[in-house]
Amino acid sequence: MVNIRPDEISSIIRKQIEQYNQEVKIVNIGTVLQVGDGIARIYGLDKVMAGELVEFEDGTVGIALNLESDNVGAVLMGDGLTIQEGSSVKATGKIAQIPVSDAYLGRVVNALAQPIDGKGQIPASEFRLIESPAPGIISRRSVYEPMQTGLIAIDSMIPIGRGQRELIIGDRQTGKTAVAIDTILNQKGQNVVCVYVAIGQKASSVAQVVNTFEDRGALEYTIVVAETANSPATLQYLAPYTGAALAEYFMYRKQHTLIIYDDLSKQAQAYRQMSLLLRRPPGREAYPGDVFYLHSRLLERAAKLSSNLGEGSMTALPIVETQAGDVSAYIPTNVISITDGQIFLSADLFNAGIRPAINVGISVSRVGSAAQIKAMKQVAGKLKLELAQFAELEAFAQFASDLDKATQNQLARGQRLRELLKQSQSAPLSVEEQIATIYTGVNGYLDVLETGQVKKFLIQLREYLVTNKPQFAEIIRSTKVFTEQAENLLKEAITEHIELFLFQEEK
């Protein structure tokens, strides 16, 4: 038997006492009273904060939204099918945050920034809160750089600047998503990070958009955040904020970002569902009272940062769907009042074959020509005026039988200008191509052509300029001004090509 000395025993006991750590861990715990429809009512959780994450026994996470006198109403970020009445819930002490990094470019993620494209985990460099405060007044500067969409109708008459919020609004199936996707495709080589947020859409539609990005090489600078129609309402409500947090990560690193929310009507519906199930009082159209704040705090995060913060920017293009062209409904009026202008897409124009179906009369950009290069200002000034006069004349001409020659000429010019604004989907044009196209139309060079020949002629003219007058594009790109030399080159190209075109058409 081993002899143990008494002093050894006392030293062992002393060591054990020294190592004893009297740390009391307080865990805030509650009990599920009721669960269903993506909502849980919890008893207890006395110290929980509004918006705090809570964790259920099965690992499902929820957000505590309603703090009432006798219970807590939490929304579930998952289906929560295995949560039972009486199971325990613990408060985590955290609020919703997501991992962010450059590695997110080219990936498809959900509202919790977890990959859903089957390409493996995404390494994160830091975390950002999903709900971050928007930059203050001192942190911003006014919008002055153009964000080219590649669509003539927008870049010439409803220009968008970097840091602006421009609403795309219209009925279903009028090409709202197409305008947004063309804008993303046009950012290729512009050093702009794009974020496309799909809220409550069909999974097939999202897959189609991702395929378009892949085919056109746009996915390398784009992040897709998708919560489809079968996702829980909580995740559909969070998806836009997740997209904004990802875009902010790049904005604060001195980069330019573009974010598309497709669409905010579905987010408002998801929020309405959550609010009604939480028994919050309904307001107009059964939306809760804070639905304005839902969108304003999201869209205020788009900004052009001041030079002290590195001049990064976040341009937001929210999409809102109207019912039968009713712009005076609750959500459309709210978002119109928050944004810096709107692009209105009309079902009638779309069905008449005018695509993109932009109603230039009621579409506006509240930033205006500050978001255009000088060359575009020089040629596009007349375009909007001529189109407005044409629309007025066209309405009048329906009732008048004999029109004088000047009116007939103006109507003919207007028809050709309208033809000039038509563009195929996924075919954005560079600024110099747009300038050449607009100049040709406004200065009457298209008047000698039939309306049906305009599109073909303009496509050939743009090709002719690239091959025979490459200096034109170089001047516009380098000086950003429509100089006399550029105008002369363009005039030469137009006159040379019109002769050639008419000769070929006669054959």
Curated annotation (Swiss-Prot):
Which InterPro entries is this protein grouped with?
Answer: ATP_synth_asu-like_sf (IPR023366), ATP_synth_asu_C (IPR000793), ATP_synth_asu_C_sf (IPR038376), ATP_synth_F1_a_nt-bd_dom (IPR033732), ATP_synth_F1_asu (IPR005294), ATPase_a/bsu_AS (IPR020003), ATPase_F1/V1/A1_a/bsu_N (IPR004100), ATPase_F1/V1/A1_a/bsu_N_sf (IPR036121)
Listed as disulfide-bonded, the cysteine pairs are none
MF (Gene Ontology): ATP binding; proton-transporting ATP synthase activity, rotational mechanism
| This protein's UniProt keywords | ATP synthesis, ATP-binding, CF(1), Chloroplast, Hydrogen ion transport, Ion transport, Membrane, Nucleotide-binding, Plastid, Thylakoid, Translocase, Transport
- This chain belongs to which protein, by name? ATP synthase subunit alpha, chloroplastic
Q: What does this protein do?
A: Produces ATP from ADP in the presence of a proton gradient across the membrane. The alpha chain is a regulatory subunit.
The record's family statement is: Belongs to the ATPase alpha/beta chains family.
E.C. number, please?
7.1.2.2
Q: Which GO terms describe its cellular component?
A: chloroplast thylakoid membrane; proton-transporting ATP synthase complex
Primary localisation category: plastid
